[in-house]
A protein has these predicted regions:
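Short regulatory "switch" loops immediately downstream of catalytic or recognition motifs
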Residues: 1, 33-40, 136-145
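Short hydrophobic-acidic sequence motifs that mark active-site Asp/Glu residues
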Residues: 10-12, 33, 133
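Nucleotide-sugar donor-binding patch of glycosyltransferase catalytic domains
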Residues: 64, 74-75, 106-173
Length: 174
């Protein structure tokens, strides 16, 4: 059993992506999860399901380790996509980088926050009634113009503050 049989809210988090440049820092995911699931917030006491590909579990380890074991579950390629979709359909919110999992969340009908920096959110945002793109304070064009090279392995999500993401999530869930 992946999810607990409780009446608690469910927050699904996709803290990884296929390119480090568009991956929000683990520390920021940790802070956002803490704020959203904390006392008095919209997902107070939520169970957190972390999702990603099998080769992304190590990248997600800091986020996993920050959540008490009894408050979290994980799927990193160890379940079918149908199982992931069933979990997304039960979720109160999906929070993650622009990725295939973000698009699955939007398709499931789950309120979805997609995080964007070096991708054009106008093309790749979560397309659904409950989908929202939250992008860095820098535009796509400014990020691309200021990166080291087109093969850059630098993180390009530096200008996306936790407060902006949490505010968007609260508005969406409310």
């Amino acid at each position: 059993q992946i999810l607990p049989k409780t009446g608690r809210p469910l927050l699904v988090v996709g803290p990884t992506s296929n390119w480090v440049g568009k991956t929000w820092h683990p520390e920021r995911f940790i802070e956002a999860i803490s704020l959203l699931t904390g006392a008095g917030c919209v997902l107070e006491g939520a169970h957190v399901l972390l999702v990603g590909a099998p080769n992304e579990r190590e990248m997600a380890a800091p986020v996993l380790q920050s959540i008490p074991e009894e408050q979290r579950s994980e799927i990193f390629g160890n379940e079918s996509l149908l199982t992931v979709m069933a979990c997304l359909e039960r979720a109160d919110l999906y929070l993650g980088n622009g990725s295939g999992l973000m698009h699955m969340a939007a398709a499931s009908g789950c309120p979805t926050i997609g995080l964007f920096g070096p991708s054009r959110d106008e093309h790749y945002r979560p397309y659904s009634k409950w989908g929202r793109a939250v992008r860095t304070d820098w535009s796509f064009d400014k990020i691309i113009a200021n990166r080291e090279s087109h093969l850059s392995k630098e993180n390009l999500m530096e200008t996306l503050p936790v407060s902006k993401v949490v505010e968007a999530a609260i508005q969406l869930v409310n």
